[in-house]
């Protein structure tokens, strides 16, 4: 006769505390691709900017608090029990998901540039928390204190940055334009310094020479170190660098002028035009970098010509978009033809100096 007593339900076995942390780190990392491609939540309600930022800041405070709690309990012995760890992990996971949910409330019509900044901050927080879980999952006796502090600090810093994120698309555009100006300024200064010293690899090679002073040149050749003829510019190279530097200076001037126009004339409600200006301006710095890298010896003049042409194309497109936008009133656009003439002059000179490369 079969027993009338039903078998007792099996009680799920919890993973070890450290195992739970490792699992949570994996779960958090799975959220990253979704945040990168996730769309804004559709709603018929009017967007309340003040409420959104208040909720986002509150969510960041909650994440920071959970990071503090977890770091405290797992940085010392004895470790919490499996049941206690489960509760801690659930709280961390809930705090992260709540933060992501608030990010999804930011609609696209508030500006793509602004949304990219908030998305980047969200990714920093999620990734920082995942790093913290991974470090804490190492037993405290094997985990250096500074590693734990660094990982926790990355979460904390990301959360602390939330109140400083621009609140509208104009402010976001100005932040991105300022970064682009700084990038191009750094590239230009590096190029000028290399030209003034006539020794483009001085910083790198000085260290190499000190560490390998007893080695023979033949050994360097075998190991792939450049020979002397590859380390310095020829007279033709130096002549070609002059218009390249001028072109990079024009790029810096272009970005600075665009930033000034956005600051003085940009309207917060013209989000699409501001996004277009930022999008094309974002292409200037990488194009400058490509040109800057191509002038280092051994220099290929054809590559310099190609990279210069790419940069010129981007600059003219940026000027065209800026001129057609609301940030450039009609009386204030006289600088654009002057800058285009300067850009064309640089490119024409580069073409003259590299024409022989095309005829080979």
From Swiss-Prot:
Region described as Interaction with TCF3: spans on this chain: 2-184, 150-360
Major site of localization recorded for this protein: cytoplasm
PTM comment, free text: Phosphorylated.
Record's GO cellular component terms: cytoplasm; nucleus
Alphabetical list of Pfam families matching this protein: GCIP_C, GCIP_N
Location of region: Required for interaction with CCND1: 2-208
Region (Interaction with RPLP0): 2-190, 240-360
Sequence positions bearing N-acetylalanine: 2
This protein's record includes keyword Cell inner membrane: no
Domain of life: Eukaryota
InterPro entries: GCIP-like, GCIP-like_N, GCIP_C
Keywords: Acetylation, Cell cycle, Cytoplasm, Nucleus, Phosphoprotein
Positions of transmembrane segments: none
Gene3D superfamilies, per database record: I/LWEQ domain, Talin, central domain
Subunit structure: Interacts with CCND1 and GRAP2. May also interact with COPS5, RPLP0, SIRT6, SYF2 and TCF3.
Family membership noted in the UniProt record: Belongs to the CCNDBP1 family.
Name of this protein: Cyclin-D1-binding protein 1
Source organism of the structure: Pongo abelii (Sumatran orangutan)
The encoding gene: CCNDBP1
